[in-house]
């Protein structure tokens, strides 16, 4: 009887941990905090300030290169 109880608890633990992993993966995909980084392509004007979007390359003479 004790062996069946230990086996039952082990199965519940495995099922619970796999469900936790699945839900953790789903949470990270649905999270609004994880956003795709945006950048300006070459030729666009570099914008300074708090709401600026960085260049994909570098900013030279107010143009993205």
Curated annotation (Swiss-Prot):
Bridged cysteine pairs (disulfide): 39-56, 46-59, 55-64
Record-level GO cellular component terms: extracellular region
Record localization: Secreted
Propeptide residue span(s): 21-36
Keyword set, alphabetical order: Cleavage on pair of basic residues, Disulfide bond, Knottin, Secreted, Signal, Toxin
Main location class: secreted
GO molecular function: toxin activity
Tissue spec. comment: Expressed by the venom gland.
Domain of life: Eukaryota
Signal peptide (from-to): 1-20
Record's keyword annotation contains Signal: yes
SUPFAM superfamilies on file: omega toxin-like
Keyword Ligase in record: no
Further facts: Usually endopeptidases cleave the propeptide at the C-terminus of the basic doublet (Arg-37-38-Arg), but here, it seems that the endopeptidase cleaves the precursor within the doublet.
Family: Belongs to the neurotoxin 36 family. 02 subfamily.
Domain remarks: The presence of a 'disulfide through disulfide knot' structurally defines this protein as a knottin.
Functional summary from the UniProt entry: Possesses strong antiplasmodial activity against the intra-erythrocyte stage of P.falciparum in vitro. IC(50) for inhibiting P.falciparum growth is 1.15 uM. Specifically interacts with infected erythrocytes. Does not lyse erythrocytes, is not cytotoxic to nucleated mammalian cells, and does not inhibit neuromuscular function. Has neither antibacterial nor antifungal activity.
Protein's UniProt name: U2-theraphotoxin-Pc1a
